[in-house]
Swiss-Prot record:
The gene is menH. Pathway: Quinol/quinone metabolism; 1,4-dihydroxy-2-naphthoate biosynthesis; 1,4-dihydroxy-2-naphthoate from chorismate: step 3/7; Quinol/quinone metabolism; menaquinone biosynthesis. One of its GO terms (molecular function) is 2-succinyl-6-hydroxy-2,4-cyclohexadiene-1-carboxylate synthase activity. GO terms for biological process: menaquinone biosynthetic process. This is 2-succinyl-6-hydroxy-2,4-cyclohexadiene-1-carboxylate synthase.
Amino acid sequence: MMLHAQHMPGQPGAPSLVFLHGFSGDCREWQSVGEQFHGCSRLYIDLPGHGGSTAIPVGGFADVIRLLRATLISYNILKFWLVGYSLGGRVAMMAACQGIPGLCGLVVEGGHPGLQNEQARAERRLSDGRWAERFRREPLTEVFHDWYQQPVFASLTAQQRQALTALRSQNNGETLAAMLEATSLAAQPDLREALNALAFPFYYLCGERDSKFRALAQEVAATCHVIRNAGHNAHRENPAGVVDSLAQILRL
């Protein structure tokens, strides 16, 4: 089995870029950024429970990484960079720390490296469980209205919240809930030590108004790029700034 994806071929010899979206996003999320790198092969993946991969069930990160590997093989992508936002960033970090073959570099935007104690994990498990129950039972417009009131999204304007709520409400609540539980931050190990031992380039992007993830970026051995005029979802709020950072990283 493989994940649904959109593939755009590039020039021979150019790096392949594999883009992973955040929770409730889909393969279109990164395209405004990725399509500025038309010399590179670009693969935009729908994670399980999302977009064209809605019907693909997973029990945890191991299943997601296995599906990611199978998808890359199916497109004959043997050397690549992973670029992931939030949930996609956590999947990318997990894949990197598990030694996914062919990975040349890692770019994470607003991805958490992992909780550091059992109390924090227990609290997160309860919180994600409550959200999952709401995704299963309530209209998605109501759930996402509240979702985007969380502190991490404090920099969004009312208009941005409204647009995101409308966009994300096109999802399937049941499969979102299942993916939220399967890939909860509570189920993710603390990756700091493994990330600090990576043998290939690791870059971290965060919006200048995203104080939580700017602080987390200092806890891993990554080169940090702060995206101006942006909060947690920097590639949506300032795509040109993220394009500039990626161009520097990839030296294109």
